[in-house]
């Protein structure tokens, strides 16, 4: 952002002129990095710390940010404010140093709320589908020439970034319920895609507490704001009478205000009709597979229609939608002969879904688009608590694939829980008699253990939220072929 644009911003938020240097602890996370990227483009001095470099930190360094790959007290020196990720503990040396120096320490969502305060905010919340829906809304607004600012939890592939500073009045942001920090946001429009039991440690294990928190989030809307909610979701349907704001519903359900009908999937694309009140039916081609993505698109269309965006711009954006990183992310199709001597090919798809509902949606999309493929899943459970709490749901969903390889649970800082490990989950699935899961004890063995199960007509789903995304990319780079020691030596 040039000096004139920065001056304009600071005239809108005059108190922000006091802030020069913003430091982020845990800056490598997608949500943290996205906000840092917007602020860097607004002209603020950005620094941050994390334990290891990744594409997010590299992008920020390209923008001039100073990144430390350690956590030391001196990193916060001269900072005007410190922004902290929910993954960072209170005894982090930088947090302690900031408190001692009386530097304000705020959560990520508080900074996002400041960015949203003087813009027309559109916040996308819900247990599943937030990232993709945020990208769809952003794509439609960009196609309509509205030049929105967006902050997303995943890579928006069309833009090549998680976040972008626009010069229009709209800020479109993913709203995170995992730590209840979305309560800081005060948007004009809020989408809620669905509500399920997840991140229950934040809500003291009380689902009623989680539901009430979503109601409180919606009541942050002004009385003239709008809640856009998926009426197919039973919890949302239950909560609708308690939402004291204007609402628009969407879904496959017949009483939805924006209704999806005649859905058909052909390969990676969904084709369906959207029925809207007082509008002509809209026949949509969506460049994203699965009924769940048709619902995400319906939410985006509901918001865009309310804003008065013309149908042609909406349709162009959805047909050309490039998706988000690690959401049914097609990494390539590879010949099998170099892998195991068989003729034919294997498709490789990477997906972030780590809740049974998300995994189920991904499997259904794969089956609908490629019904004749041998469906092979490499799955990495994420967190011992989630594996424990949703154990039976995982066991039921994972039996739907033809072949299952499972990595050890990605702990995300948690201690192991007896019976909530991958070996136990494999044993339970095997006992149900549908498939015989293969436990992969070492990620370095994935290519070697994957090769023998491929038939020549395969779709491989690499599924999970831990470090499994790196495994997916490494498989794509070596085209699924296990490397020999000689090849590894020369890399």
From Swiss-Prot:
Major localisation: cytoplasm
Catalytic reaction(s) noted: UDP-N-acetyl-alpha-D-muramate + L-alanine + ATP = UDP-N-acetyl-alpha-D-muramoyl-L-alanine + ADP + phosphate + H(+)
Top EC class, one word: ligase
Positions contributing to ATP binding: 126-132
Superkingdom to which the source organism belongs: Bacteria
Gene3D superfamilies, sorted: Mur ligase, C-terminal domain, Mur-like, catalytic domain, NAD(P)-binding Rossmann-like Domain
Keyword Cytoplasm: yes
Cellular localization per UniProt: Cytoplasm
Keyword vocabulary terms for this entry: ATP-binding, Cell cycle, Cell division, Cell shape, Cell wall biogenesis/degradation, Cytoplasm, Ligase, Nucleotide-binding, Peptidoglycan synthesis
UniProt record, GO biological process: cell division; cell wall organization; peptidoglycan biosynthetic process; regulation of cell shape
EC number of this enzyme: 6.3.2.8
Cross-referenced SUPFAM superfamilies: MurCD N-terminal domain (SSF51984), MurD-like peptide ligases, catalytic domain (SSF53623), MurD-like peptide ligases, peptide-binding domain (SSF53244)
Annotated Gene Ontology cellular component terms: cytoplasm
Pathway(s) per entry: Cell wall biogenesis; peptidoglycan biosynthesis
One Gene Ontology term of the molecular function aspect: ATP binding
Keyword Ligase: yes
Role description: Cell wall formation.
NCBIfam families membership: murC
Recorded family membership: Belongs to the MurCDEF family.
Protein name: UDP-N-acetylmuramate--L-alanine ligase
Organism of provenance: Escherichia coli (strain SE11)
Name of the gene: murC
């Amino acid at each position: 952002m040039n000096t004139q644009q920065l001056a304009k911003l600071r005239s809108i938020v005059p108190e922000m002129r006091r802030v020069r240097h913003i430091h982020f602890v845990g800056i490598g996370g997608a949500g943290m990095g996205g906000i840092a990227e917007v602020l860097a483009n607004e002209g603020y001095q950005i620094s941050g710390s994390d334990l290891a470099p990744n594409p997010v930190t590299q992008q920020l360094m390209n923008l001039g940010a100073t990144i430390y790959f350690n956590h030391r007290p001196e990193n916060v020196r001269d900072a005007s404010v410190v922004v902290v990720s929910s993954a960072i503990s209170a005894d982090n040396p930088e947090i302690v140093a900031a408190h001692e120096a009386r530097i304000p320490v705020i959560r990520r969502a508080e900074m996002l709320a400041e960015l949203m305060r003087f813009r027309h905010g559109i916040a996308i919340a819900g247990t599943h589908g937030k990232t993709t829906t945020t990208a769809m809304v952003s794509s439609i607004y960009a196609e309509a020439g509205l030049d929105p600012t967006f902050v997303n939890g995943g890579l928006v592939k069309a833009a090549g970034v998680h976040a972008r500073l626009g010069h229009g009045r709209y800020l479109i942001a993913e709203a995170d319920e995992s730590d209840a920090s979305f309560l800081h946001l005060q948007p004009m429009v809020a989408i809620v895609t669905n509500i399920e039991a997840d991140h229950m440690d934040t809500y003291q294990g009380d689902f009623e507490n989680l539901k009430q928190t979503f109601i409180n989030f919606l009541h942050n809307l002004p009385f003239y704001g709008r809640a856009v909610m998926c009426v197919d979701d039973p919890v949302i349907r239950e909560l609708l009478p308690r939402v004291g704001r204007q609402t628009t519903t969407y879904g496959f359900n017949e009483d939805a205000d924006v209704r999806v009908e005649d859905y058909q999937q052909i390969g990676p694309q969904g084709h369906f009709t959207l029925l809207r009140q007082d509008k002509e039916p809209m026949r949509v081609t969506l460049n994203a597979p699965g009924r769940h993505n048709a619902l995400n698109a319906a939410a985006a269309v509901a918001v865009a229609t309310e804003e008065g965006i013309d149908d042609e711009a909406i349709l162009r954006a959805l047909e050309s939608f490039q998706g988000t990183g690690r959401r049914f992310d097609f990494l390539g199709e590879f010949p099998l002969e170099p892998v195991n001597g068989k003729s034919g090919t294997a498709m490789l798809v990477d997906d972030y879904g780590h809740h049974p509902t998300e995994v189920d949606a991904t499997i259904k999309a794969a089956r609908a688009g490629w019904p004749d493929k041998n469906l092979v899943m490499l799955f990495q459970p994420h967190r011992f608590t989630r594996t424990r709490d949703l154990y039976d749901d995982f066991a039921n969903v994972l039996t739907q694939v033809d072949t299952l390889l499972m990595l050890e649970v990605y702990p995300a800082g948690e201690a192991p829980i007896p019976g909530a490990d991958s070996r136990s989950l494999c044993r339970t699935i095997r006992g149900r008699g549908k498939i015989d899961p293969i436990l992969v004890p070492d990620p370095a063995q994935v290519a070697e253990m994957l090769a023998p199960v491929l038939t020549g007509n395969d779709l491989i789903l690499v599924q999970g939220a831990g470090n499994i995304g790196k495994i997916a990319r490494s498989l794509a780079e070596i085209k699924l072929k296990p490397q020999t020691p000689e090849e590894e030596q020369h890399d």
